[in-house]
């Protein structure tokens, strides 16, 4: 009898990059250092050219993203995704099966839809953006992840709180914020 072994994965989550090239490069460096298998972007790239930065992800990292409410140039976004190996643009809403996890990605523009997705319990992981509020919360069986905005202009310079990504480690069954300006949490 042959037993099929499930791949244990690490997933990087980012959202609301809002044209911040420097912070996006820092996030990509964290994803590469932590050897994530997937990067999921919950939208609001703004300028489609921002997507091309994700070409710097490790060769085997798969990149998926959805459209945010500030992402108006749909053709440009689609073209940028098409130019990246192992990348796919999922338009406004995406459903993925990664390892054994049913994952939904939605920017969060419609708060009623966001709440319905949370309450539906159809997904193991729900990735949102839009609100610029960081969140890692278990709601029933669904792990809700929102890394908050990556753009530095959404944070006070007088606070330790800053731009973050989320790393979900399936092996440890743990999701955690990684502040892009602090390398102490990178393992």
Walk through the language-model features, giving the residues of each.
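Short acidic, glycine/proline-enriched helix-loop-strand junctions
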Residues: 53-66, 142
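N-terminal active-site segment of His-dependent metallophosphoesterases
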Residues: 1-53, 59-60, 72-78, 83-86, ...
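Glycine-rich phosphate-binding loop signature in dinucleotide/nucleotide-binding domains
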Residues: 31-35, 98, 119-122
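Active-site neighborhood of phospho(di)ester-bond hydrolases with catalytic His/Asp-centered motifs
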Residues: 13-15, 39-44, 63-69, 105-107, ...
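Binuclear metal-dependent phosphoesterase catalytic core
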Residues: 5-8, 95, 118-122, 140, ...
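Helix-adjacent hinge/juxtasegments
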Residues: 62-111
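Active-site environment of divalent metal-dependent phosphoester hydrolases
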Residues: 18-22, 46-49, 70-76, 110-115, ...
């Amino acid at each position: 009898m042959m037993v099929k072994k499930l791949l244990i994965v690490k997933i990087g989550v980012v959202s609301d990059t809002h044209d911040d090239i420097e912070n996006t490069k820092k996030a990509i460096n964290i994803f590469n250092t932590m050897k994530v298998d997937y990067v999921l972007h919950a939208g609001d790239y703004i300028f489609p050219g921002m997507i091309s930065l994700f070409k710097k992800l490790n060769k085997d990292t798969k990149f998926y993203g959805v459209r945010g409410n500030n992402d108006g140039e749909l053709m440009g976004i689609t073209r940028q995704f098409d130019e990246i190996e192992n990348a796919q643009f999922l338009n406004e809403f995406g459903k993925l099966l990664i390892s054994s996890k049913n994952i939904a990605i939605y920017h969060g523009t419609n708060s009623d839809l966001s709440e319905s997705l949370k309450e539906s319990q159809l997904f193991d992981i729900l990735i949102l953006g839009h609100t610029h509020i960081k969140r890692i919360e278990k709601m029933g069986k669904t792990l809700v992840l929102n890394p908050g905005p990556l753009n530095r202009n959404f944070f006070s310079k007088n606070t330790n709180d800053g731009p973050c990504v989320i790393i979900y480690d399936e092996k440890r069954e743990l999701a955690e914020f990684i502040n892009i300006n602090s390398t102490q949490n990178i393992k």
